[in-house]
Amino acid sequence: MNRFDRDVLNQSGARYLIVFEGVNDIGGVSDANAPTLTTNLINAYTTFAGTAKARGMRAYGATITPFGGNGYYTSARETVRQSVNNWFRTNTIYDGVIDFDAAVRDPVTLTNFQAAFFPGVNANDWLHLNPAGYKAMADAIDLNLFTP
């Protein structure tokens, strides 16, 4: 929230917003505070969309990618990710959703990346994909979302 004005709203000519945030927030929360974080993230995402749309921008939400295997993975944090992703997929605040989670997750172990996208650029962190994974994310974006 702190950088939203500078990084988004104050950019001249910006017409579109893709909100792809959250995994670092999730990793930093205690399991006890995870339910509160879900609410806080959804409130922030709602503010982002409303503010951007009030400025005439189109706003798209992007699901949070898996982080199973990372040192800060817990089932409580995974519940936050799944709850936020479900909200993105079903909300009516955004103009659309870009499902990065579906594009890169393993079809059997839904908490992890597909094996083809690992190791990532930061070796074994289970957060950063390799180039094939980032290409899958790019391919998940429907470019028709950006036609006037």
Give the positions of each predicted feature:
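Arginine residue identity/basic-tract feature
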Residues: 3-6, 15, 55-58, 77, ...
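Extracytoplasmic/secreted envelope proteins and their assembly/folding machinery
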Residues: 1, 5, 42-45, 49, ...
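C-terminal structural cap/anchor segments
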Residues: 38-69, 73-81
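Loop/turn elements at helix/coil->beta-strand transitions in domains of secreted/extracellular proteins
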Residues: 12-17, 53-60, 92-96
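Conserved SGNH/GDSL esterase-like catalytic core that processes O-acyl groups on lipids
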Residues: 1-46, 68-73, 128
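Catalytic His-Asp segment of secreted/periplasmic serine-dependent ester chemistry enzymes
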Residues: 27-29, 64-148
